[in-house]
Amino acid sequence: MSEKPQQEEQEKPQSRRNSFAVIEFTPEVLDRCLKQVEFYFSEFNFPYDRFLRTTAEKNDGWVPISTIATFNRMKKYRPVDKVIEALRSSEILEVSADGENVKRRVPLDLTAARNARIEQNQRTLAVMNFPHEDVEASQIPELQENLEAFFKKLGEINQVRLRRDHRNKKFNGTVLVEFKTIPECEAFLKSYSNDDESNEILSYEGKKLSVLTKKQFDLQREASKSKNFSGRSRSFNGHKKKNLPKFPKNKKKNGKEESKEDSSAIADDDEEHKE
């Protein structure tokens, strides 16, 4: 009888850290693993990732590594002990002494990060109409890598974000592509924009794609939301007050007002790592 609790206690770490197939952690794999986690904590993701940010705020900046290991793009990195090993080599991140948690060495200046986000949006395009009807959740990581390879052949990019339907969390056929520079972004738009019929047609697996600026995409999304609220659509080129939905005043959560700007920014991000 006395051995059973001891056996269960020994099995818990095994379940948490070794529930997926073990892969060979070559130096290249360790580097990819580290860069992925550093991205989660970067100025381009952390301020706008509500789940990650609130988790850190509850624990003095620390986030459980076991939580990060459940993100879709991290599930392939097993055992988790190797992830911890990779994170210990980071110049940006710090691992707790017990190896259970990770945080930024230097906290982000959120105001500066939001200014960086504005500049980031200026070099981001929305590319729509990718095949998506038959894409299952288990196929998302592979699709992510395929789309990254697709766009890297066409320009210098920083990242590709897959958009999801907020109702069923499935890929909705739209990706946000962030380029390294504004000129790179403008050159891509000039080559593939649907506004000019003489432009080269951008396609993927035989399907013609549509290219919009981030601003055009946001206006289209707002128009769609407005139509859902009022039954009437708005022009993508302007805002008509009579068609704008009326939102209630910001509700207080835990004694603090929730920022409208913050909520809008979060809605722009895909949430692939939270499933």
From Swiss-Prot:
The modification Omega-N-methylarginine is found at residue 104. Changing residue 15 to A: Prevents phosphorylation. This is La protein homolog. Residues 222-275 are annotated as: Disordered. GO terms for molecular function: mRNA binding; RNA binding; tRNA binding; U6 snRNA binding. The keyword Metal-binding does not apply. Gene3D superfamilies: 3.30.70.330, Winged helix-like DNA-binding domain superfamily/Winged helix DNA-binding domain. The keyword Hydrolase does not apply. It comes from Saccharomyces cerevisiae (strain ATCC 204508 / S288c) (Baker's yeast). CDD domains: LA_like_fungal, RRM1_La. Residues 23-112 form the HTH La-type RNA-binding domain. Molecular chaperone that binds nascent RNA polymerase III transcripts, stabilizing these RNAs against exonucleases. Required for the 3' endonucleolytic cleavage that matures tRNA precursors and for efficient folding of certain pre-tRNAs. Cooperates with GCD14 in the maturation of a subset of RNA polymerase III transcripts. Functions also in the assembly of certain RNA polymerase II-transcribed RNAs into RNPs. Binds and stabilizes newly synthesized U6 snRNA as well as precursors of U3 snRNA from degradation. Facilitates efficient Sm protein binding, thus assisting formation of the U4/U6 snRNP.
